[in-house]
């Protein structure tokens, strides 16, 4: 695929994968591992692909070289889905140099038993690789989302190579009917979300660049309305709500708490609120995390289980915490047969999160719904709808 006259796409699509990073469901739409070629007087290849696709990737590369030989392999990110082809590339093109951060070369020793010391070029923030007619200026992007990461900026065609930044789930040969944001959001908050301050730092650097195209390592090449993508990443990485709305995440066993959640959702919708509801035992928890970050209000609803909260709820709250969940209003719904304690436990688990405002009202379901708990639902719906 031609991105510009001298920049080509040589990535691959993976439709065999079911779980990305061993946990994120991509079984329906697969995954893309992106790689690019910059054809200047010298040729640079940007990143490789996952281990199962190295031969296909090298074939894609040969198809665009037109008999020429690459001079450089630029490694922006060492995660194996982007670095598995390094050794094969260096063997096939023995005159080529490898360009990466010092941290990436340290990782190469761990993965390949060598840092290619006779052929390596260490670069850091602000340094330039001149290809003749094109050049790459490197932008340090540590912890977006690994410590060795670099972005690079090609100044002639105004292209930002953004490593895992601006990536999304899904193969590139399938059109996503939901557009970019949904699976990009699930990807961001699942994989990059913990590192918001580092994303903010690299966005500040990028603000000084005239960016016309963004080439990420996953998902589509972004060529239009780039302000939208940059603004969205700024919102996500500053932990601000993207939209007004309420996510309800619940863990129910015998259906009594589920019934309370359904009544609460209906009461909120009747008050004009946008509501998304997740059964943490059955729905994709990564999507629940995604919507918890997307909206400005969250309801946690759990049964009391062995004096604590149900394990799926505990996992959900822990996942939010480790991804730096903050700046939201949280309401609690609890249930139990004799001594409901879930609200107390959830309150304690929320204590370490930054700028969390607990709703003044809660709902307690003792056994099953009754007039008292239904009245609490209405009161909570009023509070969350103000």
Per-region residue spans from a language model:
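Metal-dependent phosphodiesterase/nuclease catalytic metal-binding core
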Residues: 37, 151-215, 223-250
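FMN-binding flavodoxin-like domain, especially the glycine-rich phosphate-binding loop
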Residues: 172-214, 218-221, 263-278, 288-386
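Structural motif
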Residues: 42-44, 72, 134, 158-161, ...
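Active-site metal-binding motif and surrounding structural segment of the metallo-beta-lactamase
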Residues: 41, 52-99
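Short, charged N-terminal beta->alpha structural module
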Residues: 249-271
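Metallo-beta-lactamase
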Residues: 2-5, 100-149, 195-201
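Active-site neighborhood of phospho(di)ester-bond hydrolases with catalytic His/Asp-centered motifs
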Residues: 46-48, 70-78, 98-101, 160-164, ...
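Conserved beta-strand hairpin/beta-sheet module of binuclear metal-dependent hydrolase folds
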Residues: 2-62, 151-154, 158-162, 257
């Amino acid at each position: 695929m031609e991105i510009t006259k001298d920049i080509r796409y040589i990535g691959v699509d993976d439709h065999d994968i079911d779980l990305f990073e061993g946990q994120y469901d991509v079984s329906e739409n697969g995954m893309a591992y992106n790689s690019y070629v910059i054809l200047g007087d010298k040729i640079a290849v940007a990143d490789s692909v996952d281990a199962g696709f190295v031969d296909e990737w090298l074939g894609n590369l040969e198809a665009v070289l037109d008999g020429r030989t690459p001079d450089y392999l630029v490694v922006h990110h060492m995660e194996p889905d982007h670095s598995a082809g390094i050794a094969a590339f260096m063997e096939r093109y023995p005159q080529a140099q490898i360009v990466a951060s010092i941290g990436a070369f340290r990782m190469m020793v761990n993965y390949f038993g060598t840092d290619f010391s006779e052929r390596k070029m260490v670069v850091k923030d602000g340094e330039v690789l001149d290809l003749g007619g094109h050049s790459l200026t490197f932008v340090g992007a540590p912890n977006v989302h690994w410590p060795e990461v670099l972005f690079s900026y090609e100044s002639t065609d105004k292209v930002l190579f953004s490593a895992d930044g601006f990536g999304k789930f899904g193969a590139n040969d399938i059109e996503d009917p939901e557009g970019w944001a949904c699976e990009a959001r699930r990807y961001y908050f699942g994989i990059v979300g913990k590192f918001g301050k580092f994303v903010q730092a690299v966005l500040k650097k990028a603000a000084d660049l005239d960016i016309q195209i963004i080439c990420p390592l996953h998902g589509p090449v972004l060529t239009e309305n780039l302000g939208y993508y940059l603004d969205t990443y700024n919102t996500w990485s500053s932990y601000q709500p993207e939209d007004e709305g309420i996510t309800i995440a619940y863990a129910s066993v015998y259906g009594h708490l589920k019934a309370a959640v359904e009544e609460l959702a209906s009461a909120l919708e009747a008050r004009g609120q946008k509501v998304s509801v997740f059964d943490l035992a059955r729905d994709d928890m990564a999507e629940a995390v995604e919507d918890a970050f997307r909206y400005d209000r969250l309801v946690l609803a759990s049964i009391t289980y062995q004096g604590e909260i149900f394990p799926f709820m505990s996992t959900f709250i822990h996942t939010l915490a480790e991804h730096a969940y903050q700046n939201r209003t949280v309401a609690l719904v609890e249930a139990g047969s004799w001594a409901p304690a879930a609200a107390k436990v959830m309150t304690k688990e929320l204590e370490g999160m930054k700028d969390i405002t607990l709703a003044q009202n809660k709902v307690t379901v003792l056994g099953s719904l009754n007039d008292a708990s239904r009245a609490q639902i209405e009161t909570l719906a009023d509070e969350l709808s103000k």
